[in-house]
């Protein structure tokens, strides 16, 4: 079945999102635009003999996710996995240990960037830099830096500027979490109270701003205008993504496209552009820059899709934050949008943002009774397969294979 899936994938020119913007361009890349959707229809029509020209967006996505429903049965991989063979035949422990070699002292170095004289502001700004996070983004960035350097000139050395990108990515991500918690009025994250819960909303906004300013200073210190342009695009995307999340669409077809665009801007853009930034610093080849970007984008979208699945399938203790949180915020994520196809009565709840008493519980039950979780997981698998296809274009190395393994971990994580 797996080989059949790969034959189908190779024969399909579908790219789940638009190609990356060039240096300095506004970069309005978003997942699965109209031209890509049209190409998918044409490809599937040729291969299946079906007329898909009139299939609306969400049904097209659902058709693709159900085309090979049993693919990608990936065995679970944990950080404690013993040494194993990589795709290139070399041994390593696991991607996190491999990536962490270049990230020792990560959070200490971030705290040094936060040069603050006011003790309260310092405490707020350093609150999430306690070393207890997953450090998923810095790990990907460090591995991508080595993979690109090896591909370019067989150098296993990570430049100081590339390591700085890993720090900056984590700082931008953390600042966005602080601001998101204010907007969502969240009370817990990573198993502890949020900054806004402890210090209040006004001070939390300022703490997030301070982290962003420190990240901007660190970015300017690198001195590469192309890299600066790439990463400042991330900050714009974060803001635009939050605005997209605050809005909604009445049309079902527009609703799913809206959701995927929001997912790209709020989550995937940071990973994609951070990967691209380290590739620019380590290799002059634009083809490599595009590979790095596409890998990060596809893994980032898959990561958020699985996060949306876990909101329905994991308990609060596992997630470190309340489950069904998205429904309580009035958000219709992938599992909800797919479930709505089986239970059209959910449309009214989506439009009123689950605001009536009992809406959240009813919507959750509809999702669990439907194949919404399964279909969202299948869609995440497709994005991860695309990420693997992209990164496999680089020269074989332990770091490249670790990035392949990371894309598989994204699908099997439970928190």
Swiss-Prot record:
CDD domains: Trans_IPPS_HT. It catalyses: 7 isopentenyl diphosphate + (2E,6E)-farnesyl diphosphate = all-trans-decaprenyl diphosphate + 7 diphosphate; 6 isopentenyl diphosphate + (2E,6E)-farnesyl diphosphate = all-trans-nonaprenyl diphosphate + 6 diphosphate. Heterotetrameric enzyme that catalyzes the condensation of farnesyl diphosphate (FPP), which acts as a primer, and isopentenyl diphosphate (IPP) to produce prenyl diphosphates of varying chain lengths and participates in the determination of the side chain of ubiquinone. Supplies nona and decaprenyl diphosphate, the precursors for the side chain of the isoprenoid quinones ubiquinone-9 (Q9)and ubiquinone-10 (Q10) respectively. The enzyme adds isopentenyl diphosphate molecules sequentially to farnesyl diphosphate with trans stereochemistry. It is found in: Mitochondrion. This is All trans-polyprenyl-diphosphate synthase PDSS1. One of its GO terms (molecular function) is all-trans-nonaprenyl-diphosphate synthase (geranyl-diphosphate specific) activity. Its EC number is 2.5.1.91.
